[in-house]
Amino acid sequence: MAKIEKTQHTTVNLGKGLMEVYDFGAVKLHAYKTNDLITDECFLIEKNGKGFLIEAPCFFDNIKELEAYIKGLGISYEGTVIAYHGAGASFMKGAPVYSTRNADEYSHKGGGAALVSNFAGAFGDSFDSSIYTTTNFIDGNTITIADVKLNIDITTEAFDIEIPEINVIYTHMLGHDCHSIVAGISHADAIINQLKGYIEKGINLILTSHYTVENLDDAKTKIAYLDDLKRIAAENKTAEDFKVAVQKKYSGYSGLNYLDMTAGFFYK
């Protein structure tokens, strides 16, 4: 399989959002940058005149925009795979919805439901707070949709997805040059081990629902950042000192609200 760099894509400006299209030959990956208020990303996988979406937009204008894009492709829409982002259920109404039982629970009763409630309060009528109803539960560790095999990796909240045919992984968050939520040292170690696993497997591209497409160099950058967080936490006695030290080392990083949350976890 030919390796594709994260910059090897064509870009389609949809008005609000951007579509970055990666051509793997038999399979195309359409990475949708929503440009919404929570920097969501969604991923359309296309093969043999069929397609499905990994995660979905949750603002009504993005929903309309993406539906029009998919219609314009002239493909048969085979369903929506919902892992970490359960809101936006008006998208492609009537299409199959795939999820695991733990992800469905997370979206309807767990932390995902709480986030949706908060977003609905913050964003009002522009936000589609309706939660997807799962029509097709994924009970095994593999599933095939639109002729594309997916490997399912259950996580604490939901699940990650590997697409072996194009050597791509989808996980909730990475973001190599921004702060992210790190819930203490054990969580940092878990993320490091996860990213090292991607490196060992030689994964081509890493997809996440809050950042543009990334690669293994980005994974290495994130590992170094996480190691630094652990070191800085060991050297500082208060959350405030920790945040100052991290910001000094990573002054260009966005996501200071996530750094605040991380500090709260490290200094309980």
What are these regions (language model features)?
Residues 188-245, 251-252:
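Divalent-metal (often Zn2+) His-rich catalytic cores of metallo-beta-lactamase-fold enzymes
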Residues 147-201, 214:
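Active-site-proximal loop/helix segments of hydrolase catalytic cores
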Residues 54-58, 180-185, 207, 230-233:
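Second-shell loop/turn segments in exported
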Residues 2-5, 238-268:
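C-terminal regulatory/interaction regions
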Residues 13-68, 159-173:
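Conserved beta-strand hairpin/beta-sheet module of binuclear metal-dependent hydrolase folds
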Residues 49-51, 58-103, 202:
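Active-site metal-binding motif and surrounding structural segment of the metallo-beta-lactamase
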Residues 38-39, 60-62, 82-91, 104-107, ...:
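Active-site environment of divalent metal-dependent phosphoester hydrolases
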Residues 4-18, 108-158:
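Metallo-beta-lactamase
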